[in-house]
Amino acid sequence: MTVETFKPKQTTTLDIPVKTLEAASTNAVTTGNRIGFVSLGCPKNLVDSERILTQLRIDGYEVTNSYANADLVIVNTCGFIDAAVEESLDAVREALEENGKVIVTGCLGAKENQIREVHPDVLEITGPHSYEAVLKHVHKYVPKPEHNPFTSLIPQTGVKLTPKHYAYLKISEGCDNRCTFCIIPSLRGDLDSRPAGSILDEAKRLVESGVQEILVVSQDTSAYGKDKGGRTDFWNGMPVKQDITSLARQLGKMGAWVRLHYIYPYPWVDDLIPLMAEGLILPYLDIPMQHASPRILKMMKRPGRVDRQLEAIQRWREICPDLVIRSTFIVGFPGETEEDFQILLDFLKEARLDRVGCFKYSEVDGAVANTIAELISEDVKEDRYHRFMEVQAEISAERLARFVGRTLDILIDDVDEEGAIGRSFADAPEIDGMVFINGETELEPGMLVRARITHSDEHDLWAEVVDADTQD
């Protein structure tokens, strides 16, 4: 079951996925049990939104995509960087102006005083993954409607905010690392891994409902199970080890694409690469490296042996030649010198990463990094950002060019009057490039087709269909 959520008038300024809703209509009548929902931020937050929406539907509430139709609006906020805070506050403001009855949840909700200073009229505020508290507040202001649950059955997969052919699967909450630029542990707590059996049950339901791509997410995916103390769980009557490699192996047996996100560079990441080489999970590694200067990495409290990272990249590619590596970096970190930045550029040129995101350091309220060294001016950060992206654009173009002439499986995401738009194993939704198949207007979202790559640039691929699987 998919639902529509509002699209705030303020467009996103973030380089991360944002699921939003349609603009409010001006002529509407409320029924007393309609809830509007604004979901901002990363895929982990989107999963939280899906969970809240699912329970609302189970409780008999309707979900509307209009402010005017809504009896109450929930805003699930992001508070990771200043731009996210600003956007979240703007979304709350708009919801108050358009509707007036607003509950705020999510990461920014952990900073209630900050929200109250700007928006004192918000009804209630909860922090991240406070599902029961959100529902309790909804029941308070919009009493649970009387309904027959057998006439409004919810699919086993619950409410989804993604297209029906792919879904995010969150395997844990929180993080045990203490990177100095990050406040996630203070917002979401330490690592709390879900039982493996619960994860595999959810994945099975997703695949049985038609999901063809499972995107595994958490704050620290490769740390999955570290908090379990080596204890096994059970699934289908069999013991299952609770670590990321064992979990990935089980997920890979379900017949869908499995894509891993947010892989912290622990040594045991090596164990995942053979699974990619075997074809059990996609040969796609999203591994945020953040910087390459040992001095800056030490200040960030990140792994600082860049030589080992380069050796690992070479080793991974030898084991799995098709491996696509995505990473993110921060430029303008406090105390970053031109020498540090040049080390980062040299690393890019040597590592030849496939997909790279770059963020200018943001002085996140509460981050230790704000006070450990002199802050970098906005002009310098902007200059380094553009120089970084210029270097990476050439590398990305080179890496994508290797696909020209090859035939790949393409998962179709959208079709318009010009043709179909899809993704290969090398492309995660929302954040990576796309594969354009011009003229193929008869294809449908969710179809998996074989297509020969004919052209590439630094972001995207173009292809011609060779064969199509007509099953959605």
From Swiss-Prot:
Where in this chain does the record put each Radical SAM core domain? 161-398
Where, in this chain's numbering, is [4Fe-4S] cluster 2 bound?
175, 179, 182
Recorded GO CC terms: cytosol
Task: Answer yes or no on keyword Metal-binding.
Answer: yes
Q: Which InterPro entries match?
A: Elp3/MiaA/NifB-like_rSAM, Methylthiotransferase, Methylthiotransferase_CS, Methylthiotransferase_N, Methylthiotransferase_N_sf, NA-bd_OB-fold, Ribosomal_uS12_MeSTrfase_RimO, rSAM
Q: What EC number(s) does the entry state?
A: 2.8.4.4
What cofactor requirement does the entry state?
Answer: [4Fe-4S] cluster
Q: Which GO terms describe its biological process?
A: tRNA modification
Catalytic activity, reaction form = L-aspartate(89)-[ribosomal protein uS12]-hydrogen + (sulfur carrier)-SH + AH2 + 2 S-adenosyl-L-methionine = 3-methylsulfanyl-L-aspartate(89)-[ribosomal protein uS12]-hydrogen + (sulfur carrier)-H + 5'-deoxyadenosine + L-methionine + A + S-adenosyl-L-homocysteine + 2 H(+)
* Gene3D superfamilies, per the entry: Methylthiotransferase, N-terminal domain, Nucleic acid-binding proteins, tm_1862 like domain
Q: Select a single GO molecular function from the record's annotations and give it.
A: protein methylthiotransferase activity
Query: How are cofactors bound according to the entry's free-text note?
Result: Binds 2 [4Fe-4S] clusters. One cluster is coordinated with 3 cysteines and an exchangeable S-adenosyl-L-methionine.
Q: What does this protein do?
A: Catalyzes the methylthiolation of an aspartic acid residue of ribosomal protein uS12.
Q: Which family does it belong to?
A: Belongs to the methylthiotransferase family. RimO subfamily.
HAMAP family named in the record: MTTase_RimO
In Swiss-Prot or TrEMBL terms, this protein is called: Ribosomal protein uS12 methylthiotransferase RimO
Q: What is the lineage of its organism?
A: Bacteria, Pseudomonadati, Pseudomonadota, Gammaproteobacteria, Alteromonadales
List the gene name.
rimO
